[in-house]
Amino acid sequence: MKDKIVIAGYGAVGQAHEYLLERFSFKIQVVDPNYYKKTWRDVGFNGKVFDYNPQAVIICVSTPQNTDGSCNIDNVVDVLNDVLKPVPVMIKSTLSIEGWRKITAMFSHLDITYSPEYLRQENAIQDFEFSKEISLGGGDIAYWDKLWKYCCKKVIIREPEELILGKSFRNAFLATKVNFFNQVYDMCKACNIDFEQVRQEVTN
């Protein structure tokens, strides 16, 4: 596979995908209004998805919280509006179930796949390079399965809404875990007890 792929969004996730896919000789075009500022590369002009006639699109744009706590999908919708022909699309951006349902209803003519990301911002490239698995669901499974296996990843296939809810609960669990051990640390400090020894007793 040597397809031309557009990556929309050049934050940590977009950069990690660009790095890995270019290593496997895919032709990558980034669409991001701040791309030049982030890389100092001369891109000629600030194009949109349809300008590059890609074989596939990976969406890594931000989905910030609205004031009511819901997931704002406007950036994802903006990218999808620029996909003018039915090519495989993979969304890596964080979505809610409601957001996913709205997107798939609005763009029912597109093959849209969802794939959650669990990369740490400060180590995104290394995390993605050395991860062994990638989960995905919906859309053109056959295309993405072939692509990621070509990049030496084990592909786990689930329903998109299972993946969305799984990521949400995983993040909640990790936050609870951090809060739990913060309380353990405070208790150890108050009692003048070695926190690291207690932590090992809890986790081993």
What is the role of each PLM region?
Residues 1-204:
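Structural/interface elements that position substrates and couple domains in central-metabolism enzymes
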